[in-house]
Amino acid sequence: FSAALVSVIVALFLGYGKRILPEKMMIISVRTASIGYALPGTVIAVGVIIPFAWFDRKIDSLMGSYFGISSGLILSGTIFAIMFAYVVRFLAVSLQTVESGLEKIKPSMDDAARSLGYRPREALMKVHIPLLKSSSLTALMIVFVDVMKELPATLILRPFDFNTLAVRTFELASDERLADSSTSALAIVLAGLLPVIYLSQTISKTRLK
């Protein structure tokens, strides 16, 4: 859930930044940030672990040289590493949903916020985010489900004794314990139905208006 929440928050800032600064460099930066969804989870995991491992080695070398101690793994094999990979992997999903919500907010709302003396950050917090509650919730649920069923990146980056439903299902199924794996597999399926039900209700309410 934390990874999904961080992904939505980053998407809000990127989407709003693109809205108020529609420059070519900003647009390219946003599109580059959302390229992770087109890459396999394994590729992203390797792309995360290489710089993190390099950083850990450098810090360990410095600690050994100056203090005679080993710092161990600071980033590699931590919850931070796996959350970072999740955000890179699924940022495009939340960004697309947030941008869709921002397109529904008329530019006159930005003009009204500026006329009231709101700075861009204040306009985002007091005007746009309240209007983006539905889009943000949709993005949160979709990314949460995607994170829940992500397997390759989780297997490579997860800390010791850290399991997700996808990993648990994979381990039990690999051991031919199909009956035991069905519980966690069913939980993933049921979680995947939540955004579908929510979106169906939202669409129905929109049509009735």
List each model region and its residues.
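Transmembrane alpha-helix signature in integral membrane proteins
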Residues: 1-18
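Membrane-interfacial helix termini and adjacent extracytoplasmic/periplasmic loops
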Residues: 25-29, 45-87, 121, 157-160
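Transmembrane alpha-helices
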Residues: 35, 39, 88, 95-98, ...
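Membrane-cytosol interface at the C-terminal ends of specific transmembrane alpha-helices
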Residues: 75-114, 139-140
